[in-house]
Amino acid sequence: MIPQISQSPGVVQLVLNFLQELEQQGFTGDTATSYADRLTMSTDNSIYQLLPDAVVFPRSTADVALIARLAAQERYSSLIFTPRGGGTGTNGQALNQGIIVDMSRHMNRIIEINPEEGWVRVEAGVIKDQLNQYLKPFGYFFAPELSTSNRATLGGMINTDASGQGSLVYGKTSDHVLGVRAVLLGGDILDTQPLPVELAETLGKSNTTIGRIYNTVYQRCRQQRQLIIDNFPKLNRFLTGYDLRHVFNDEMTEFDLTRILTGSEGTLAFITEARLDITPLPKVRRLVNVKYDSFDSALRNAPFMVEARALSVETVDSKVLNLAREDIVWHSVSELITDVPDKEMLGLNIVEFAGDDEALIDERVNALCVRLDELIASHQAGVIGWQMCRELAGVERIYAMRKKAVGLLGNAKGAAKPIPFAEDTCVPPEHLADYIAEFRALLDSHGLSYGMFGHVDAGVLHVRPALDMCDPQQEILMKQISDDVVALTAKYGGLLWGEHGKGFRAEYSPAFFGEELFAELRKVKAAFDPHNRLNPGKICPPEGLDAPMMKVDAVKRGTFDRQIPIAVRQQWRGAMECNGNGLCFNFDARSPMCPSMKITQNRIHSPKGRATLVREWLRLLADRGVDPLKLEQELPESGVSLRTLIARTRNSWHANKDEYDFSHEVKEAMSGCLACKACSTQCPIKIDVPEFRSRFLQLYHTRYLRPLRDHLVATVESYAPLMARAPKTFNFFINQPLVRKLSEKHIGMVDLPLLSVPSLQQQMVGHRSANMTLEQLEALNAEQKARTVLVVQDPFTSYYDAQVVADFVRLVEKLGFQPVLLPFSPNGKAQHIKGFLNRFAKTAKKTADFLNRMAKLGMPMVGVDPALVLCYRDEYKLALGEERGEFNVLLANEWLASALESQPVATVSGESWYFFGHCTEVTALPGAPAQWAAIFARFGAKLENVSVGCCGMAGTYGHEAKNHENSLGIYELSWHQAMQRLPRNRCLATGYSCRSQVKRVEGTGVRHPVQALLEIIK
């Protein structure tokens, strides 16, 4: 039995008083003080961990102003505040103690657009890709690019002055910010825009907080103008935080306070809105993927690409390429980056040309390609091949791979992981190759592996050395390397921070600004935040205050993780290896990961949030001397003793009386998971929440009773076959209003599905497929076996959507094969989802033995529901290991593709069909939609894939009363719109859950693709 974890870091009374008064004064946002909420805000995409005291989620600038006004009261003068955006920073920019002000949950509105003048006004929580999706119909985009664009907020981009691919042409974020609305500590609203110097000077004479700010920035930047110009490196990725260089324009006629706020990392004010310059979308885009025999060759050849007037040149090394090859993302780009025969590709330059004049762009591209052919022929520059991509879809797939490369590095095998700490150094591009040679020599001298990729055209290369932060000696080495890289970048006239902000690295600022200019930064900080209450420890302390700076060797996640025994870390690596990349925060409703995060906007309910909580739970167990691996081994094989039952009952009674146990917070996070398994493939680190969720639930319920619904769900495969003998009787009973009311109130289940009428057995009476014995199958000759298909039943389709199985049997017959309906054998997936892992292992072993016996017949076995079929491949393998055996159950599309391989494609005509894939299917098998389309094409039918996210049903998730609202909300995110615009009778869904959800919400259901094929084939 796990212990009660009754202690967690408390919240100081002053913080609680502040939050209470904040709500009393009309704050309309959310506040959070639970340990789980604070833990999710204690990390970002960096190696650091710092627990805040509380989190607030404002809904408007007025809410932020209320926070700032109340904070200015003397009684709260000791509280500190840190603005936070998407939480994707790689250097801990938004990590701090005190109160986190999260702008991402609610402040995500696009306020207005002026296409004629080319600008848009947004709130700080708008995500970069969200904005570009909105701008696309207007023919515009927000140009600064970054790898986390589908979850990074514009407020975060402004605060770090982010930039990435294309910066040589498009510049940094600050080059596109026309003005901001910022709230100062005290509640004053500061609106910035470029002003004539005379007006700025006049504003500086005002005896107000804003006047003091204008005066300080104006006077310091004017008086130190020459020093600033001399000290700021002449780089595309210029020095920011604070950008003293660009406050005045070159002619000294214009003053723009915006430039001080961009890159300020929340140390000066709360940026709540911004007016942004938007760029016309280029009409023509071409990509040339240039392949090299070494990474050094790729680096040294990059200036040649820039000279060819390319928009951007992105470089990727062999380590990153090889990790991409092992990831699901490679499926989408493999044809665009093929291997060169008899050559090893060890470097890649992704070269983009873009513009409005197609003839001019093609002329430049062709000139480059001619020159590349010459280099290949003469064996020069290490070029071994190239491929051109002319289609926009292909260009976007290549960049999606490049973006995912950031996270893929974290999936490297072993305890040492490539980590960010000196990854965005910037040097003059002409020195980059030599600089990187020295950088590599430095890392090689310590015997470290590393991955490299980046924006070689701008002199920025992302370098992530592999270190084990659970090893104190390697943590010390990380600081040593940081110091060495500072010296190395200075040697080449570069910067330590080219695009990702300073964060915990701000201690190195004097080395780049110089002591005299660093003192000027402190004066600016003092004008905005004299008492150092906004994100203290970052950028610089205010003048006149001897306040400490954050350090590179501050507390890291590894400091906490190393408290967990190595064996536990290894066995629970699905949670331990989360590096915080945050891809699970992807805003796109059509992205399958993560539906619970999308509908709640609560990061507790994301793979990252759940992994964070489980890591802390394991640490707290270790702190109490509890070994979860030993507990798992000691779990009883069957039943529980009366003594244990009494103890669980007592513990559950106390839990219902709100007795605290951190395990309850973890349980709450796990309960929101749909177990769709999208994270197990879509996450670059392959964080498999359903797997460690099941293990947690199993251990949690050693202390607490399980709800009745869990037992009902886990035994559905036992009682469904019994009820199916009299389906009308069961359906009549379950349809009674009183029964439904009791089910919702006392069991917690709603909209229970009805059994199929007639049942599958009734439909198959007398059919040969249901009447063949094992002996008859074994007696078939080789030719007969080659034409026989074994249909594997699953509990949901066979008993609740039996027509699909019956139609598949008929389809197999229609194609000239002999279908045989195998006896139903429980799959066990429902047991796995609910954490009945011992019971699941028994079920899996019994069914695996049966299917292995069938596999020896040498006939294909086929199932129709993707989630259940894939359970045989994934969960069975984890539960049984080698005892699983070698059996293979094919999905319907896999078998059809093989069976129809020799059949030519017919002329495609007629109205389209529309394919809705199951989450588990399309994430684990990304080629499934195309495979289905190819099958339909063989019969002259067109099948179009519909890009949607999760339907919200996910097995029994949508039937649980506590999930009902979220289940319907998830459906609304993408499925409902698609169903409304497409003819329902042409929509097809492979998942039973998906079809069930459509019928529940829309009133009429959709069919399985095999049913459409049965109709199509004459």
Task: Give each language-model segment a name.
Residues 3-5, 203-248, 254, 524, ...:
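Flexible inter-domain linker/hinge segments
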Residues 157-159, 163-250, 254-325, 330, ...:
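Mobile "lid/hinge" segments at catalytic clefts and subdomain interfaces of large enzymes
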Residues 46-77, 81, 99, 103-148, ...:
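N-terminal glycine-rich flavin-associated loop
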Residues 529, 536, 690-1018:
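Iron-sulfur cluster-binding electron-transfer modules in prokaryotic oxidoreductases
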